[in-house]
């Protein structure tokens, strides 16, 4: 059954999914699920406890202690685990790499799938941001969007994001990692990064954040 209270935003990193989700939530008053943060949470806990044994990592996760909220200082969406804001720990490249490694494991995807599905009845509606939200996690969503952008633009956005965090970056290396991850994500056997058949594909390369939000609002209200 189609659910008109679920909107999914899929696409690779750096296309503006998180910003769009936040802006739509402001406009619609809906709850946000940033699924990528959940995978980065697993990567962070792996690094913190020096283990790649997912069974051990699972024991560190209290399902009741996972929630998202807006950060008023930088307008980002923060992931909390047991009242600890993980935002500053899960955004570095080492954690992102570990998150990608865990994301291909069926046991990890199955575990996080259940957590993500648990968000569907929270609030007035749900905006789910990820890579397989419209294809796997919420196939019943009425509104499905898939964002794209050039690798150059995505690398530029990531560079700005890292610089804001005080980190030095190499633009060429960033772009190479983006292209490498795209290839891995789109060709993996489990939940490949592809648009849902009924998703609307939008290239965000030349769209401002509010232009993108207005475009999506116009579509869902038409």
Indicate residue ranges for each PLM-predicted region:
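Hydrophobic anchor at the beta1->P-loop junction of P-loop NTPases
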Residues: 7-9
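P-loop (Walker A) phosphate-binding loop of NTP-binding proteins
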Residues: 12
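ATP-binding Walker
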Residues: 15
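Walker A/P-loop
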Residues: 18
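N-terminal phosphate/diphosphate-binding loop that engages ATP/GTP or pyrophosphate donors
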Residues: 27-93
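Small-molecule kinase domains that catalyze NTP-dependent phosphoryl transfer to phosphate-bearing small molecules
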Residues: 71, 116-123, 131-140, 166-215
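ATP-dependent NMP and nucleoside kinases share a basic, alpha-helical "lid"
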Residues: 87-165
């Amino acid at each position: 059954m189609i659910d008109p209270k679920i909107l999914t935003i899929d696409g690779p990193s750096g296309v503006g999914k998180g910003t769009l989700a936040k802006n739509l939530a402001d406009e619609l008053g809906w709850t946000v699920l940033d699924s990528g943060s959940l995978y980065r949470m697993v990567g962070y806990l792996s690094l913190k406890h020096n283990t790649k044994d997912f069974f051990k990592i699972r024991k560190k996760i209290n399902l009741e202690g996972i929630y998202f909220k807006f950060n008023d200082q930088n307008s980002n969406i923060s992931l909390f685990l047991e009242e600890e804001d993980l935002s500053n720990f899960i955004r570095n490249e080492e954690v992102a790499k570990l998150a990608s490694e865990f994301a291909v494991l069926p046991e990890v995807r199955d575990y996080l799938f259940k957590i993500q599905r648990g968000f569907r009845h929270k609030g007035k509606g749900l905006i789910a941001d990820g890579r397989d939200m419209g294809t796997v996690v919420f196939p019943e969503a009425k509104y499905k969007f898939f964002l794209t952008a050039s690798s150059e633009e995505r690398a530029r956005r990531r560079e700005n994001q890292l610089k804001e965090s005080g980190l030095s970056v190499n633009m060429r290396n960033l772009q190479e990692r983006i292209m490498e991850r795209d290839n891995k994500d789109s060709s993996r056997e489990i939940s490949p990064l592809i648009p849902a058949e009924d998703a609307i594909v939008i290239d965000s390369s030349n769209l401002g954040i509010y232009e993108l939000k207005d475009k999506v609002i116009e579509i869902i209200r038409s």
